[in-house]
Amino acid sequence: MPRHWNEHYSDPANLDFTPVPLLVEVAERMPPGRALDLACGYGRNALYLASLGWQVTAVDSSPVGIGILRERSASLAVDARIADLERGEFPIAAGSFDLVCDFFYLQRDLFAPIREGVKPGGVFAGAIHLVDGAPGARPRNPAFLMHPGELRNEFAGWKILYYSEGAEAGRSRRAARIIARRA
């Protein structure tokens, strides 16, 4: 998988450094602390959080993406790491982060470590593609798609601050989006 993303990130036309709107909403309501950006790509969300004073750990399997992030974050508090999450190369330490974000990367066995990695009172913010997207939309592999309600169920017992399912304006792929606070 890194090969595909390395090629994708090598084309400047594919790089948009605008943070995900859901993350902006979260960051505006929290004081800076420690954040984890999973499957960060070239780091648009990590850069945004760091610009607000967050200490960010950003993880991705793409050396090209992490290289771009490292270049752009030289003066910011970003620890950019190359790690294959599917192989367990980045263990998430319990109670380490005030904020964990995961946008459009699904690895179901990461949810338990993610929940443990968020400090009590901390927040998870994320969005995952749904199986009922438009025909031809990507990703197509069912392993990378959630069923309606599945993301909400992963955070049962947490305070759900925001939850929605549907397509964003201008997008064909439907997604589940969540902001949840650990009790």
Model-predicted segments: where are they?
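A short, conserved alpha-helix within the catalytic core of class I
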Residues: 106-117
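Conserved SAM/SAH-binding beta-strand->alpha-helix loop
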Residues: 62-64
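A short acidic, Gly/Pro-enriched loop at the edge of an enzyme's catalytic core
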Residues: 90-99
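Conserved SAM-binding strand-loop segment of SAM-dependent methyltransferases
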Residues: 75-87
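Conserved beta-strand signature within the Rossmann-like core of class I S-adenosyl-L-methionine
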Residues: 122-129
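Conserved class I S-adenosyl-L-methionine
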Residues: 1-30, 33-41
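Conserved SAM-binding motif I beta-strand of class I
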Residues: 55-60
